[in-house]
């Protein structure tokens, strides 16, 4: 049997130590070897280093003194990651048997793949038991006019309808296995997104370098969706809308952006303003308008960077 390659598992914690420990316990239950584990703490109110070091000595903890967001937090661990593959997983997710091995074997047999995600299923509403309700079995391409796309299989009952690996438009940031060489060929995740759309942007850049994105449904992860961010919070409204526009700016040509901006100005903005106002959701309305404003102010700034930058902020702490 071929020797399994080293995998560097990276998860980001932000005021969610209970979720992080549940993830680490599930990793112990369904171990893959060889494996190195990194927990990046994104400036949680209570520093979790002591607890993690005492109870999970195999875990390497990286502490940032400011919240760097999803991409920035994950990127912080990359200079220390030695694995042939990098497994990015949300701390509000849990492992299943042979998940990581199945993903690694897929990558070993598909050299065109830059990234592969497992099938994602929801926990039940109490977040205490798993369910057969699918969250993700792939994603379609982002529409050039609306900047929206579809999550394949979302909220379907799992009846084994997704049983073979498929080429897809985008991996899911909650769980994705990436080749280490992607960092050199494509670059890091773009940390300006902070929250949402980072993996979609990364997948677009991978495709431009000739690498494909896949889903392998024979590997499964359970995800406690919205455990970290409220389902209709102002935070989520702001970053989803801000980053949807930023994604289009980064990945579409000037010619293709013309119909998108026409649709945005004359349909998307009026529709959202009207909807939030009629519902009395004034915090969400303000968040939406701030998202649009951010892109107007940011429009002339440089938004493209391929170079891999391993320089570290001064405020990181690395613990063996």
Q: Language-model segments: which ranges?
A:
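Short aromatic/hydrophobic "clamp" motif used to bind/position activated sugar donors
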Residues: 86
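Short beta-strand/loop segment that forms part of the nucleotide-sugar
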Residues: 35-43, 62-64
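Acidic/His-rich active-site region of diverse nucleotide-sugar glycosyltransferases
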Residues: 76, 95, 102-188, 192
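Non-catalytic, C-terminal membrane-associated alpha-helical segments of glycosyltransferases
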Residues: 235, 239-240, 255-320
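Catalytic donor-sugar/metal-binding loop of nucleotide-sugar-dependent glycosyltransferases
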Residues: 166, 176, 180-195, 200-222
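Short, acidic, metal-binding catalytic loop of nucleotide-sugar glycosyltransferases
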Residues: 25-34
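Acidic helix N-cap motif at the loop->helix transition within catalytic regions
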Residues: 46-54, 98
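Glycine-rich, basic loop-to-helix element that forms the pyrophosphate-binding segment
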Residues: 23, 63-81, 91-93, 102
């Amino acid at each position: 049997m071929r020797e399994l390659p080293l995998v560097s598992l990276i998860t980001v914690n932000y005021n969610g130590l209970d979720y992080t420990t549940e993830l680490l316990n599930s990793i112990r239950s369904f171990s893959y070897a060889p494996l190195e584990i990194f927990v990046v703490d994104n400036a949680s109110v209570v520093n979790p280093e002591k607890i993690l070091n005492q109870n999970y000595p195999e875990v390497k903890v990286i502490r940032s003194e400011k919240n760097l967001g999803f991409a920035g937090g994950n990127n912080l661990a990359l200079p220390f990651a030695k694995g042939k593959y990098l497994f990015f997983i949300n701390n509000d997710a849990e492992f299943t048997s042979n998940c990581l091995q199945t993903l690694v074997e897929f990558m070993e047999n598909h050299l065109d793949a830059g990234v592969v995600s497992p099938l994602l299923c929801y926990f039940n509403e109490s977040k205490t038991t798993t369910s057969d309700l699918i969250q993700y079995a792939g994603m379609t391409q982002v529409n050039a006019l609306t900047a929206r796309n579809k999550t394949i299989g979302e909220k379907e009952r799992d009846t084994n309808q997704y049983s073979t690996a498929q080429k897809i438009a985008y991996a899911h940031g909650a769980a994705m296995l990436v080749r280490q060489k992607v960092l050199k060929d494509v670059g890091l995740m773009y940390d300006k997104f902070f929250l949402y759309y980072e993996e979609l942007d990364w997948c677009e850049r991978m495709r431009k370098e000739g690498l494909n994105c896949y889903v392998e449904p024979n590997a499964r992860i359970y995800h406690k969706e919205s455990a970290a961010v409220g389902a209709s919070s102002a935070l989520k409204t702001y970053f989803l809308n801000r980053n949807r526009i930023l994604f289009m700016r980064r990945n579409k040509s000037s010619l293709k952006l013309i119909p998108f901006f026409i649709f945005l100005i004359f349909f998307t903005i009026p529709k959202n303003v009207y909807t939030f106002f009629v519902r009395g959701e004034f915090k969400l309305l303000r968040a939406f308008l701030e998202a649009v404003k951010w892109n107007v102010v940011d429009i002339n700034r440089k938004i493209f960077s391929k170079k891999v930058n391993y320089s570290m902020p001064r405020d990181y702490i690395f613990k063996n």
